[in-house]
Amino acid sequence: MSCRSEHIWIELIVGSRKISNFCWAFILFLGSLGFVLVGSSSYLGKNLISLVPSQQILFFPQGIVMSFYGIAGLFISSYLWCTISWNVGSGYDRFDRKEGIVCIFRWGFPGKNRRIFLRFRMKDIQSIRIEVKEGISARRVLYMEIKGQGAVPLTRTDENLTPREIEQKAAELAYFLRVPIEVF
């Protein structure tokens, strides 16, 4: 989503609160909880899950392995739920022609660098760069090339924009910032 006027362009960034992340975290939690319950029921000799009789699964080696995978899955699931609740990666890109400043803000993981805030002068922006990698895992990323700073990514690598969408976004931004476009 973006808000644009004659002098200011604000692009909101979604971050980790995407439907796919919610689905993966939920599925991973349920699956790993099932693995822990099956491993525990094989250890206790009681049916904690009515789908699988505990006598059919021996604790050594199947029960131990299932418990290990279940615990590992719970850790990964809790990591996903934490990134969703902290909304890691969300923020905004603000381009202000009136003040001549570009601000890039992202939320990170809790700690000293939770707030990631970059500020540049517009006259330091050399170009808008599109990097295209075709093949099995094709990706198109939009960068802002800044003097002395290198390239700052403006789109996420997992965004999967079509060539037309990335070109249109790059053209609009380059026109707004009055800088050239480079394609790599």
From Swiss-Prot:
The chain crosses the membrane at residues 19-39, 57-77. HAMAP family: Ycf4. InterPro entries: PSI_Ycf4_assembly. Keywords: Chloroplast, Membrane, Photosynthesis, Plastid, Thylakoid, Transmembrane, Transmembrane helix. Seems to be required for the assembly of the photosystem I complex. It holds the Pfam family Ycf4. The gene is ycf4. One of its GO terms (cellular component) is photosystem I. It comes from Eucalyptus globulus subsp. globulus (Tasmanian blue gum). Belongs to the Ycf4 family. It is a multi-pass membrane protein. GO terms for biological process: photosynthesis. It is found in: Plastid, Chloroplast thylakoid membrane. The lineage of its organism: Eukaryota, Viridiplantae, Streptophyta, Embryophyta, Tracheophyta. This is Photosystem I assembly protein Ycf4. Its main location: plastid.
